[in-house]
Amino acid sequence: MIGPHWSKGWIVEDCDVSHSKCSGISLGKYLQPNNDNKWLKWKYKDGTQTERDAICQASYEGWDKEHVGSHIIRHNHIHDCGQTGIVGHLGGICSLIEDNDIHDINVRQNLAGAEIGGIKMHAAIDVTYRHNHIHHCTRGLWLDWQAQGTRVTQNLFDHNSLPNDFKVDQDNIDDVLSGLGEDIWIEVSFGPTLIDNNLFLSERSIRFAAQGVAMVHNLIAGSFTATGRGTDNNSVNLPSNRFTPYHEIHGTKVMGFMTIQHGDNKFYNNIFVQQQLRPEMQKLAEMKKDEPDDWDDYNFEVGTKPFSDYPTFAEWDKQFDGYCGIYAPNSDHYYSHLPVWSAGNVYLNGAQATAKEENPFVDTADQVKLALEKREDGLYLKTNLYDFVPEKTDGVISTATIPMAFEPEEKYENPDGTPITFDSDYFGNHRDGVKVTAGPFSSAVETEQKLF
């Protein structure tokens, strides 16, 4: 319905955008006639290869932050669209998407497959998603390829999966799975992707088909799924790695390609809460618990436990002892999982930590309640969470304390290259002192404030 068409600096503000059969707002790319749906029309190159071709061609034909992107999409009500609320491919770089209410996207399932979500963007380089409410969508936010320098901060995600009244049985399970979404899907990206001070209240929080993600000061009440999978390309007998580009720091020039090794993720000062699944979702979980596929492991257990088999930095670093170079002994260490860092996290209601996290706070005895309460002036969090969360137990996180994203060798910093100190919370209130409390709120009293 609204599209800048490969231009720069549009502002879409205070609009009601609804009932598009496809997408509400498009931040897409220009037409490349030689690449127009080439996978379908020419057939001989897989879509992942034609995607790489399109990216490289665009970088030779004017795709840079001086000419494209830097849009502002804010204070909009975007709802009841068939495919996406906001969509973008290359054309949304360096944009700010904030204070939008995005809901009821793809809930009718009249369109299915890829490119579905409240927001779906390829190459969200240096894009900031701030203080949006994304809810009641098949999927909340889908960051596909090159989420480099991307920041997701101070957002509220809820009810982004199957509808409340869904039913599942052996006859309809394939149709049901096509609508099994999550709050965020990060796919074939090397980061740095920064996710901080958000509330994830859907039953599935993050689909981790990527690496280089840092999660800091979030409330996470859903599971991590697709850990270590979802990055190959559907071959049957032969390898089909998706070679993925990474870029110059805060720019679009392609610096190299690599396969996804998984790992290189960082979890600091988050609160994990295991929610009780809806009865029908529990039934679905039981039906699929022993049937993972190449794209999803159907995990519904909350916490960092899926990363238990990943090395710590010390374990990974030890592989490189001694001589490394030509004629060194053959080794897999350049292609194995990258390390995972985890510290300062709180695990409640049976949420589980990675086996290698040192001194996590785990409370399995008490029962935390989480619910959204809709009042006349907006949404509030109804919870007893801070009856059990310890106060001021861990240090302040900053750009300097987070290891850089491995493949692009880029720090978790602002788009202008300045460092970030995570001393502001979901509401923008200051976290005082050298020790801070885990989660998106600086203190318990803030749970009484309006979320959105």
Give short role names for the model-derived ranges:
Residues 259, 368-440:
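C-terminal accessory segments
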Residues 1-5, 9, 18-395:
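Glycine- and acidic/polar-rich repeat regions and solenoidal domains
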